[in-house]
């Protein structure tokens, strides 16, 4: 994690509190998903008619993902002992999600698919510490 990851995310996502504070973990997840989802929804409105079927489907799936809590991730968060390196790892992934969402804001239809795949991968990376 870069030392500025938490500050970077907090500057763009109101009420982001990282995951070190057990009481705010759910809220942190919610505000992050809301931020990403709003950018995705804006892209849907801006270039939705220009998207191919595959990209449109991926966009819709990611918007839906942002609307609902990932139950496995939240359950893990509720019971995890997050040491500083693990918190740093999660915040770095969140920064990546924020950066990608900001790129979506200005992406044209032809660039959107690769960004959406990167967002999907970043969300999956948040789940990597979960026990198998």
What are these regions (language model features)?
Residues 1-48:
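Leu/Val/Ala/Ile-rich N-terminal alpha-helices, chiefly Sec-type signal peptides and the beginnings
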């Amino acid at each position: 994690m870069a030392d500025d990851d938490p500050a970077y995310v907090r500057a763009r996502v109101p009420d982001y509190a990282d995951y070190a504070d057990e009481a705010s973990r759910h809220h942190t997840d919610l505000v992050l998903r809301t931020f990403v989802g709003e950018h995705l929804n804006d892209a849907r409105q801006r270039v939705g008619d220009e998207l191919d079927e595959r990209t449109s489907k991926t966009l819709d799936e990611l918007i839906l993902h942002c609307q609902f809590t990932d139950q496995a991730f939240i359950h893990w968060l509720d019971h995890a002992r997050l040491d500083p390196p693990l918190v740093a790892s999660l915040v770095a992934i969140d920064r990546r999600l924020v950066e990608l969402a900001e790129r979506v804001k200005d992406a044209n239809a032809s660039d959107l698919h690769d960004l959406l795949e990167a967002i999907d991968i970043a969300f999956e990376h948040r789940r990597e510490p979960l026990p198998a």
